[in-house]
Amino acid sequence: MALIFGLSEKDTETLHTAALLHDITKEKTPGEQITLCRVYQIEYTETYLSTPALFHAKTGAEYALEQFKGTVTKEAAELIRTHTTGCVNMTLMQKLLLLADGIEKTRKHDSLVSLRSYFYENPGNKDLICHLNDTVIRYFDLTVRFLLESGQVIDNETISARNDLIIKRGK
């Protein structure tokens, strides 16, 4: 993806580092995640307690910074922090990591396979950034739909990130 979007060597390295480490704390138990939140003074909401899978983005960012000092930059850590929920005013690299994680080839759900095909096919008359934004919006829509249908809590950051992209698309 970095090549498709013409990232600089430095940005490519930052994105690559974040991609390698984005799930570094994913296998930790909810109790271990809460302990890491205390250690790193990370605030979390009731949403995180209801959906513990969200913790790993925040804890992973801080853990990676601590464990890989000098390799993991604050920018790479921010990419890790937002790779699950997104955020308002997402950067190009944040969108790329979120999407790469969401549509990676190990994801076999039909809707994600379709989204992966949509992303990698020719964007038609749209420029690449518009195509990326449209794909990220579609990814958020799939995520929200899945969470609604399975009766799970939806994180406010995801809704805000999605709405932000839609509002900006209209301008």
Which positions does each model-derived feature cover?
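Short amphipathic alpha-helical segments, especially helix-boundary/capping motifs
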Residues: I34-Y40, L54-F55, G70, A76, ...
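Alpha-helical segment that forms one wall of the substrate-binding/catalytic cleft
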Residues: H56-E66
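Divalent metal-dependent phosphate-bond-processing catalytic cores, especially two-metal-ion Mg2+/Mn2+ enzymes
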Residues: M1-E9, L21-T25, E66-K74, R81-K171
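Active-site metal-coordination segments of metallo-dependent hydrolases
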Residues: E46-K58
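His-Asp-centered metal-binding catalytic motifs of divalent-metal-dependent phosphohydrolases/nucleases
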Residues: T12-T45, G60, E78-G86
